[in-house]
Amino acid sequence: MKQKNSLLGMILCLTAAVVWGLAFSAQAVALEQVGAATLNAARCLIAGLVLIPVILIFDSKTDRRLFSAKEGKLRLDVRKKEWIGGAVCGVLLSIATILQQLGLATEETDAGKAAFITTLYVVIVPLFGLLRGKFPSLRIWLCIGAAVVGLYLLAVPVTDGGFSFRMAYGDLLVLLCAVVFSLHVIAIDVFSAETDGIRLSCIQFFTSAVVPSLVMIFTETPTLAGIWAAILPILYLAVFSSGVAYTCQIVGQQHLDVSIAPIVLSLESVFGLIGGAIFLHETKTPLQYVGCAVVLLAVILSQLNPRKKR
């Protein structure tokens, strides 16, 4: 039975990684029709709506039902920490995704490259642990160093005069996105311990829809024609990348060892590279492929715990 659960967890986490990886290509396609703020607002609004039925299903098995048939109305019994946590996580998520999408909108940053740079958040998280008095181990520092080398090979262009030390603007935006995603992971870690994960995510998505909506009003002029032209990638991002993949991650991690799940989920970078090659016909130089391999290796090694006994 245990083996069956482990297999289920592996399949679900791998499904989440595939969906998230292909989401980079979906974002690139959608950004050809709508602005980053418009895309993020539409995506998060739909994602929040998609999670409401999921909440109803899960709450029907508990005494914290969102809908009360007896009262005939919605019971707003979400605890204060869920509202605060969802709002904080939502603001961070909206900033991270807008930075990512602005980077993808540039010519020099493609979906495959963005996928690997974004995955660096796994390595960056331990650095923020310094602010909480948690000093990273030597293994983590080595992984951080390897990640920097991989990022250099992946993102810094090679000219006739040799290697350049100038990072492309789009790649820099995606790197900033990885930093904000690191803060997002820490925020989830802080708030998720005493909150319902799906409710927290739902509030997060609705908050994440408000922030870019305000940006959209002042900086973009979205049209119904543009939104309709991008409706398929928007629905993919909202329903599959947010609703389905998030649920797969939650259930999958319940059946998979805590040291294995992050490694499987980090494979989204590989599927992001594959998706960019298949759907967007993206290509990489040999050095960039080496950079991808180094980044992936650094991410995987950072999640391994040699002291953990099974």
PLM segments and residue spans:
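Hydrophobic transmembrane alpha-helices of multi-pass small-molecule transport proteins
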Residues: 51, 136-158, 212, 266, ...
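Helix-helix packing/entry segments at the starts of transmembrane helices
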Residues: 17, 40-42, 114-120, 187-209, ...
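C-terminal transmembrane-helix exit sites in multi-pass transporters
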Residues: 50, 54-55, 121-145, 270-290
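Specific transmembrane alpha-helical segments of multi-pass solute transporters/efflux pumps
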Residues: 23, 58-117, 153, 238-256
